Amino acid sequence: NEYVDKSGLNICNILDQKIMDNPRVYSKYLAQPNIDAIFYTGYGEKGDGRIKFSDNGKPVIEQRSVLWEGIDGGSNRGEESTVISQINSRSANPHSADGYTFVFVHCWTKNQQSIKTVIDGLNDNVRVVPVDQFVQLVKQNLGPK
């Protein structure tokens, strides 16, 4: 918690496996006063984009799409066109977890141009926001009342 405070960062990313159904893992992080949210990337997992809340109302947000060349050994799952299609086909309802997409970008196989290609291909009803605003919207629209 002290190092999180010193860094000025209050959102963490956890790279692990199968923690969305194990609150004992993420609740320890979210119990820290200087951590506001967790983005969860399941290594090798497809990711369902689930959003859960700890007992103190802080969210853990699972990846829904990946921008990662060769993620499935030859499938197109991590390619720009696939991610664009996935996002454009989903709900854009901010009051449903289905309306939010956390895209994990693999920095060794994709770059800023890949991200720009995805953004440029999104429908007009899709908003791309910085991570802190994403968390704020999730808390505001989906969090415990």
Question: Residue ranges of each PLM-predicted region?
Answer:
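Binuclear metal-dependent hydrolase catalytic cores centered on His/Asp/Glu-rich metal-binding motifs
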Residues: 73-81
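Catalytic domains of cell-wall/extracellular-matrix polysaccharide-remodeling enzymes
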Residues: 1-74, 114
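C-terminal domain-boundary segment and adjacent tail
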Residues: 4-15, 27-34, 48-50, 80-145
